[in-house]
């Protein structure tokens, strides 16, 4: 019975620990074998960790590329073509407008600074969490109300019912706020608008 138990233990050790001889071993030899197994595992561990680290870095890079590609595909305006896909580098630099400007259709889009006064075209509403869309050479009809934008945003075909053509004006709207602007102005001059720059890719 004891021999059968020893044989069973030897078989378990040979399958799950490391290769040991088929013959029965004394406790001293078993301790020595356990130490060898531990040393082998310690040697294998840095390689396994290195492989896992490389695999994790590859997975993280792939996820970052996917996220960046998704962000680039979202349109900022129904009248403008969506921006070209940025390079798939994970080190893309994002910049915010400071200060944030709004402006009519004669004002160029881009990153607004105190030196280059450009109308921000990456606006996002912090209240309804919608991207702000713009329509050049249009203004909002005075009959617009909150429910109209709530129900029709961002479908241009439904929104155009309350858009009127007017040269030089740019119509801005999110799901909860709207405004028509003719000249360059600071966003802070419009306290009712809860809009912020949603970052530009440089």
UniProtKB/Swiss-Prot annotation:
Residues making up the signal peptide according to the UniProt record: none
Record's keyword terms, sorted: Cytoplasm
Principal location listed in the UniProt entry: cytoplasm
Cell compartments where the protein resides: Cytoplasm; Photoreceptor inner segment
Transmembrane segments: none
Superkingdom assignment: Eukaryota
Pfam families found in the cross-reference section: RMP
Keyword Metal-binding in record: no
Gene inactivation effect: Results in the cardinal features of Bardet-Biedl syndrome, including defects to the ciliated Kupffer's vesicle, delayed retrograde melanosome transport and impaired visual behavior.
Region described as Disordered: spans on this chain: 71-90
GO biological process, one term: melanosome transport
Tissues in which the UniProt entry reports expression: Ubiquitously expressed during early development and in adult tissues including the eye, brain, heart and kidney.
Any one Gene Ontology cellular component term annotated for this protein: cytoplasm
Biased composition (Polar residues): 74-90
Functional summary from the UniProt entry: May be involved in photoreceptor outer segment disk morphogenesis.
PANTHER family reported for this sequence: CILIA- AND FLAGELLA-ASSOCIATED PROTEIN 418, PROTEIN C8ORF37
Listed name of the protein: Cilia- and flagella-associated protein 418
Biological classification of the source: Eukaryota, Metazoa, Chordata, Craniata, Vertebrata
Gene behind the chain: cfap418
């Amino acid at each position: 019975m004891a021999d059968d138990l020893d044989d069973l233990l030897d078989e378990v050790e040979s399958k799950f620990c490391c290769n040991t001889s088929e013959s029965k071993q004394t406790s001293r030899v078993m301790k020595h074998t356990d130490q060898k197994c531990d040393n082998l595992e310690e040697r294998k561990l840095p390689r396994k960790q290195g492989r896992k680290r490389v695999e994790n870095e590859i997975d993280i890079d792939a996820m970052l590329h996917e996220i960046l590609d998704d962000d680039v595909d979202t349109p900022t305006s129904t009248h403008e073509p969506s921006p070209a896909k940025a390079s798939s580098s994970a080190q893309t630099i994002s910049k915010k407008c400071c200060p944030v400007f709004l402006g009519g259709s004669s004002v160029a889009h881009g990153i607004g600074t105190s030196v280059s006064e450009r109308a921000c075209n990456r606006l996002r509403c912090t209240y309804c969490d919608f991207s702000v869309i713009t329509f050049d050479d249009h203004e909002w009809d005075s009959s617009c109300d909150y429910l109209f934008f709530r129900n029709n945003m961002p479908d241009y075909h439904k929104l155009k019912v309350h858009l009127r053509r007017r040269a030089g004006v740019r119509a801005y709207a999110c799901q909860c706020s709207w405004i028509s602007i003719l000249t360059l102005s600071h966003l802070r001059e419009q306290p009712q608008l809860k809009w912020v720059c949603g970052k530009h890719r440089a």
